[in-house]
Every structure is written in structure tokens, then in C-alpha cells.
């Protein structure tokens, strides 16, 4: 699944993921603090924010989504 994400900054990669009922907008303060020294990727998990909806909502599927995103970004 192609997740919605934002990417800012440069340096070591930090992938930020929100908790239940959240979205990447919840990660703004943390992202702002990390951006001066890191490449920050903030992610909307499946069924959250602007990412696609799916009937499947479990940890293995969400983990695979993150692996796919990392592959797409050559991380």
C-alpha cells in the first residue's frame, strides 16, 4: 500500500509514525526538532490521515507498508 508521507531535512533518517487514531499532523513538533539534523519522514499509517483505506488493519500489514515505503525511498 502506498502511504501518504512528508519528507523534510537531510542527514540520518528518522521515520516518524503516529499512534492509534492519529495522523502525521500529530508529529509536527517532533519533526520540527529533528529536521535541522535529520531526514525526517512522517507517515500516515493505513486507514489514517490521507493514506488509503483498507479492510485489513493489523500489525503485519502495517509493518509491510513501512517496509514498502522504505524500499520505495531506497532506505
What are these regions, as identified by a protein language model?
Residues 32, 42-75:
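Active-site loop/oxyanion-hole signature of alpha/beta-hydrolase fold enzymes
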Amino acid at each position: 500500500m502506498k502511504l501518504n508521507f512528508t519528507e523534510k531535512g537531510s542527514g540520518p533518517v528518522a521515520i516518524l509514525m503516529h499512534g492509534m487514531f492519529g495522523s502525521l499532523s500529530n508529529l509536527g513538533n517532533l519533526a520540527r526538532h529533528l529536521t535541522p539534523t535529520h531526514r525526517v519522514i512522517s507517515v500516515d499509517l493505513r486507514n489514517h490521515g490521507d493514506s488509503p483505506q483498507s479492510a485489513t488493519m493489523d500489525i503485519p500489514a502495517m509493518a509491510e507498508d513501512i517496509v514498502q515505503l522504505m524500499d520505495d525511498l531506497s532506505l
